[in-house]
Design a protein with these regions (language model features):
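An acidic-aromatic
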Residues: 21-77
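Gly/Pro-enriched, hydrophobic low-complexity segments
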Residues: 91-201
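Amphipathic hydrophobic-ligand
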Residues: 8-10, 35-39, 141-145
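Short, surface-exposed charged micro-motifs
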Residues: 13-14, 34-36, 119-121, 150
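Beta-strand-dominated lipid-handling architectures at cellular/organellar boundaries
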Residues: 7-15, 20
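A short, Trp-centered hydrophobic/proline-enriched beta-strand micro-motif
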Residues: 1-4
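C-terminal low-complexity, charged extensions that often adopt amphipathic alpha-helices
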Residues: 65-97
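Short, low-complexity, Pro/Ser/Thr/Gly-rich segments in the mature regions of secreted, periplasmic
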Residues: 200-217
Length: 217
């Protein structure tokens, strides 16, 4: 995790159930969890165990709290290195004409805009791997840059074992996170638990983000 004046490295466990939910567990000290987040099709839940507080809200209430908006399926596609169409669960052949394609030899640039005017730019190589995804707002001042590297075969398909995610403002990084996957398992039973202790205080997602930006770890 890289924020202005605040850097932290940690073990993170990521669990995902396709088209349902995924869960992140941050364990920086000897496997002791300090932070957990679960994102489902319609809601976001976060537990901050160090400060005994939590977030539980649906996407409708979160609108306006984050500079970039996309649905669960779009976020799932970012984590699984897939092309996606803003606001859609999948891409059917009848939607192909919404994309603009530019090719330069084996490389390709694929672009699409959503109803808010956000521009989604996907860069792909000759093997049809997504190398990066950039989501920028109309003025091009703010953007989310998601880069993929260190591709290895998983179930016969290339998967990026490194993901670098940066929030950009005027072309400069304002903070981000780099994910290094040590291993990946697919098609295995997944148990997701998100019990919230009764004494924890409920707060908003914006309060969590503000805290991460202002406190040193």
């Amino acid at each position: 995790l890289n924020l202005p004046g605040n850097n932290m490295s940690s073990r993170v466990d990521l669990k995902m159930v396709k088209d349902s939910a995924f869960q992140l567990s941050v364990q920086p000290f000897l496997g002791i969890e300090v932070f957990r987040a679960e994102i489902s099709v319609d809601s976001v839940k976060v537990i901050d165990r160090m400060n005994k507080r939590y977030v539980a809200d649906n996407y409708a209430n979160l609108k306006g709290q984050t500079p970039i908006e996309f649905n669960f399926y779009n976020l799932q596609a970012l984590f699984t290195n897939r092309l996606f169409l803003p606001g859609q669960q999948g891409i059917s052949p009848k939607l192909y004409n919404r994309f603009k394609l530019k090719q330069d030899g084996p490389a390709a640039e694929i672009q699409v805009k959503d109803v808010m005017g956000l521009l989604y730019t996907f860069m792909a190589d000759g093997e049809e791997k997504i190398l990066s995804t950039c989501i920028s707002e109309p003025s091009d001042r703010y953007a989310l840059q998601w880069d993929y590297a260190d591709f290895r075969l998983a179930d016969g398909q290339p998967f990026p074992m490194r993901m670098d995610v940066q929030v950009m403002k005027d072309g400069a990084s304002q903070g981000g996170v780099t994910l290094h996957f040590s291993r990946m398992q697919t098609d295995v039973p997944v148990k997701m638990d998100f019990s919230i202790p009764a004494k924890y205080k409920r707060i908003t997602l914006s309060q969590i983000i503000k805290s991460l930006s202002s406190n040193k770890m």
